[in-house]
């Protein structure tokens, strides 16, 4: 565990700045599409998104005028979005996807301003125009499509329990009774426990990032963590004393989030993702999976198929 704690300490947060004057300006469009809210009220397949297009609109034009894509990311999620302690560079599956978006819109994968945002600040960062996109293992669900717009799914995950290997906790079941369980604020893991906790103690044990849950687990302050299995696998890779318990108990999809009303940006993102999924084992998606996730999440043969809607 000491090695994992050392890696944790090596990560320094990038601030989600509130001021102007850095050439970043406002991000995204301003209008809110009523049709999206109506869809949320009758939600069945929230992962359906607008059909892809390369046409420019207000949101794309603003990014091009600025000359930089502002991306809200995590830098504490191993394999997904984290700061390499040896080089100081942001790396991971989500970071590769951000770079693909920047290359498509601006012609250069390096034209990105990264802003680290906590789990519970992802929606607010979009509403307040602090970022153009959030690429941060953000689950698409019926509640969230009332607040933000999403691309098609770029990864399928599920909620799962992480606990010490020697723990009597067996998974998302009665073995959690009386146990202290950590979740991230604003996460679907918290929502799952709020709906059915099996007697676990989780109120007052939320943190701003999933990595903080791992630290609490290492320090013995909590008995288990509930989070996306994709994130939990990365946490287990950082600390060989913990492991995933039981099976995933939900099916969730990650999407790129943007401000409501930024339809042109959503369509452009879906165009980028269509290209990103292509090529089979030699395509960008499978190469990124092989580089970042395959060792900890083996067995994935292809990216999730996109689902579209017409309005």
Which residues are covered by each model-predicted region?
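Extracytoplasmic small-molecule ligand-binding "clamshell" domains
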Residues: 26-134
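Hydrophobic residues within well-ordered alpha-helices
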Residues: 101, 126-127, 176, 217-218, ...
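Periplasmic-binding protein-like
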Residues: 155-163, 233, 237-273, 295-311
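Acidic, polar ligand-binding/catalytic clefts
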Residues: 99, 110-174
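A ligand-binding cleft/hinge motif common to bilobed small-molecule-binding domains
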Residues: 121, 137-146, 218-251
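Short helix-initiation/N-cap motifs at beta->coil->alpha
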Residues: 56, 112-124, 169, 205-215, ...
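Bilobed "Venus flytrap"/periplasmic-binding protein-like clamshell domains
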Residues: 90-105, 138-141, 157-209, 224, ...
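Extended ligand-binding regions for polar small-molecule ligands
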Residues: 30-54, 167, 187, 256-296
């Amino acid at each position: 565990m000491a090695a994992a704690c050392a890696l944790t300490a090596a990560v320094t947060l990038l601030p989600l700045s509130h001021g102007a004057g850095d050439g970043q300006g406002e991000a995204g469009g301003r209008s809110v599409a009523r049709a999206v809210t109506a869809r949320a009220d009758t939600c069945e397949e929230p992962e359906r998104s607008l059909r892809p297009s390369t046409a420019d609109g207000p949101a794309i034009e603003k990014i091009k005028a600025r000359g930089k894509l502002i991306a809200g990311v995590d830098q504490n999620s191993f394999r997904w979005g984290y700061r390499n302690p040896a080089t100081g560079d942001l790396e991971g599956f989500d970071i590769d996807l951000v770079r693909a978006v920047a290359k498509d819109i601006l012609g250069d994968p390096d034209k990105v301003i990264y802003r680290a945002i906590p789990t519970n600040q992802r929606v607010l960062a979009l509403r307040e125009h602090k970022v153009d996109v959030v690429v941060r293992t953000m689950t698409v669900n019926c509640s969230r499509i009332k607040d933000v717009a999403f691309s098609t799914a770029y990864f399928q995950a599920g909620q799962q329990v992480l606990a010490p290997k020697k723990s009597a906790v067996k998974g998302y079941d009665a073995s959690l009774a009386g146990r202290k369980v950590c979740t991230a604020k604003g996460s679907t893991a918290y929502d799952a426990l709020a709906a059915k906790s099996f007697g676990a103690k989780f109120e007052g044990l939320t943190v701003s990032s999933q990595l903080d849950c791992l630290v609490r687990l290492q320090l013995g302050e909590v008995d288990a963590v509930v989070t996306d299995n994709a994130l939990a696998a990365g946490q287990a890779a950082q600390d060989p004393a913990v492991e995933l318990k039981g099976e995933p108990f939900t099916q969730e999809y990650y999407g790129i989030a943007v401000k409501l009303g930024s339809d042109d940006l959503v369509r452009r993102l879906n165009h980028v993702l269509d290209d990103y999924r292509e090529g089979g084992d030699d395509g960008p998606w499978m190469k990124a999976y092989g580089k970042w996730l395959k060792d900890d999440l083996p067995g994935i043969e292809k990216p999730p198929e996109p689902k579209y809607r017409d309005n």
